[in-house]
Amino acid sequence: MSLELYSYWRSSASYRVRIALNLKSLPYVTHGVNLMKNGGDQWSVAYKEVNPQSRVPTLVHDGQRFSQSLAVIEYLDETFPDHRLIPRDPVDRARVRMLSQIIACDIQPLQNTSTTVYLKEKLKLDDAAVTAWLREWIVRGLDAYHAHLERDHLSGKFSHGDTPTMADCCLVPQLFAASRFGVEVTRWPRLALIGENCAAMSAFQHAHPSRQPDAQ
């Protein structure tokens, strides 16, 4: 078995996959892809051969290449079923996917590097306007995530029950991003508590951006 992860230390999507790999105790080799240096290493010819979309993360498993973080996590869950991150029950599975997609599909694309670069370089927004944009969509998305947890009463120590799922692999990086952009996560008490429970686990600790070999 050979697992390689092309990752950027501060990428939320890469962070999700690192958490999933760690929760499953899967060893892997990290290849840093600097999204900021000289316009971004992701646009290089060499990396386009790895991932034609020029995004991170990309997982390579025994020569097979996979991108899109949720697809990667689902692949890992099906290939390495120990410590399941997606429940077997159809209702529970759909709920975990729903929570994951609130973050991966609705929040994060509006705050990723390519979006912020476009806002600054093409639309000529200043830093204050870009930060306001980021905060707006983070708050809207996490408001919805928190409302689902409050309504459904299915969360425990984590987003769905008392063991981490794919939803928590998505939530923790988003809470990190929220704090980075000046959003106080204590406005969502349940999310803050889940974040604390995750932070107590070594799988989440070792996935943290500050612990990555390409951290700056």
Residue spans for each PLM region:
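GST-like domain detector, emphasizing the conserved glutathione-binding G-site
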Residues: 1-129
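Residue-level detector of family-conserved "landmark" positions at structurally sensitive sites
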Residues: 31, 69, 188, 208-209
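Conserved beta-strand edge residues that scaffold enzyme active sites
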Residues: 34-36, 192, 212
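GST-like fold's C-terminal all-alpha helical module
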Residues: 103-200
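Carbohydrate-binding/catalytic loop surfaces
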Residues: 165, 212-216
